């Protein structure tokens, strides 16, 4: 990494509003109807090293208006490691007083202790990966997530003062129907998120090995996917039920997302 960053100093452009993105990579072991995660403690050390290297190459402390923890499952690292990363970021860059700090959350592994860490780090926005509340769909995607886990995550977040909560749902998942999509969106809206985003599922088993466990015959076709997206939009947009963003897409379009 040091070699890759060598010579960057002369090319660093200090923008009036810089963004930072921190990706936490997670080794995930997927099995039929089950998944477990093993976290290498060196992950946070590697992120810290890269932060220090980038900061050292800048001609001056870069001003920061937005920080996003994503790309993996950032809240699965230890709370103390997250706080250490945030402390390093604040010491390495010039955070604006109005800086937005956003974190992606995995509800199944999110703890009250991690919520406390997010509050201490002054996190302002969170995004919860939900995908679907339908147990049949969850089983088909090997991602069983009880509604109680999502509810507990929201309660922990609101308890420590984080109210800007986004839900990520999906359509186009195996065994999904128009009815199950609308029911999942209804359940999500009932939890009062600040924003609801509905993405199209992208089935790319050649890229995502865990998707090879999915029964392709259970995937809705393009017409069915379109019906699902339209149904969610028509159900909520006319009623003004919060800010709902339905990102319609074909299976391999840029706005589609693979199952996490």
From Swiss-Prot:
MF GO annotations = 4 iron, 4 sulfur cluster binding; coproporphyrinogen dehydrogenase activity
User: One Pfam family for this entry, by name?
Assistant: Radical_SAM
Q: What EC number(s) does its UniProt record assign?
A: 1.3.-.-
Q: Which residues form a coiled coil?
A: none
PANTHER family, per database record: COPROPORPHYRINIGEN III OXIDASE, OXYGEN-INDEPENDENT COPROPORPHYRINOGEN III OXIDASE
State the protein's name: Uncharacterized protein y4hJ
Q: Which SUPFAM superfamilies match?
A: Radical SAM enzymes
* Matching Gene3D superfamilies: tm_1862 like domain (3.80.30.20)
Where is the signal peptide, in residue numbers?
Answer: none
- What is the organism of origin for this protein? Sinorhizobium fredii (strain NBRC 101917 / NGR234)
The record's Gene Ontology cellular component field reads: cytoplasm
Residue span(s) of domain Radical SAM core: 6-239
Superkingdom is Bacteria
- Keywords for the protein's UniProt record, in alphabetical order: Oxidoreductase, Plasmid
Q: In its UniProt record, which GO terms are filed under biological process?
A: protoporphyrinogen IX biosynthetic process
